[in-house]
Amino acid sequence: MPKLFLRLDLAPGHALGPGKIGLLEKVRDLGSISAAARAMKMSYRRAWLLIENLNESFDWPVIDASTGGLHGGGATLTRFGLEVIERYRAMEATAEKSVSTHIKAFERASSVKARGVRAPRS
């Protein structure tokens, strides 16, 4: 089924899309950048760089991270980080709703079937 992909280009080299939002949601749910990275099958370094890029994209940080210690470190989303997720998901829902008729038309016309096999062209 065709799916809408929403990406906001905030500035050159700074974008916000489903990958970064997914990472923020995992950090929110798991309380750790490391755990979020593992859950998303990416390196800790990659996750850290994505979060650093997000923090540089806005006037306020999206994550508040603490370094390890006796009980290890952790990360929590800032109030602004939670707002970023909320606004992105709201925009995504609004966009999907507004183009749903067109997406259904593409779905009906698509030659890609449920198993992902492309029908032969004549």
Q: Which residue stretches match the model-derived regions?
A:
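Short, Lys/Arg-enriched N-terminal segment that forms or immediately precedes the first helix
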Residues: 1-12
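Alpha-helical linker/hinge and terminal dimerization helices associated
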Residues: 84-106
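Residue cluster at the C-terminal edge of the helix-turn-helix DNA-binding motif
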Residues: 56-61
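Basic, amphipathic "hinge/linker" alpha-helix immediately C-terminal to the N-terminal HTH DNA-binding motif
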Residues: 65-91
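Central "turn" residue of the DNA-binding helix-turn-helix
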Residues: 41-43
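Residues within the DNA-recognition helix of helix-turn-helix
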Residues: 50
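Short helix-boundary/capping micro-motifs
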Residues: 27-37
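C-terminal regulatory/oligomerization modules of transcriptional regulators
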Residues: 101-122
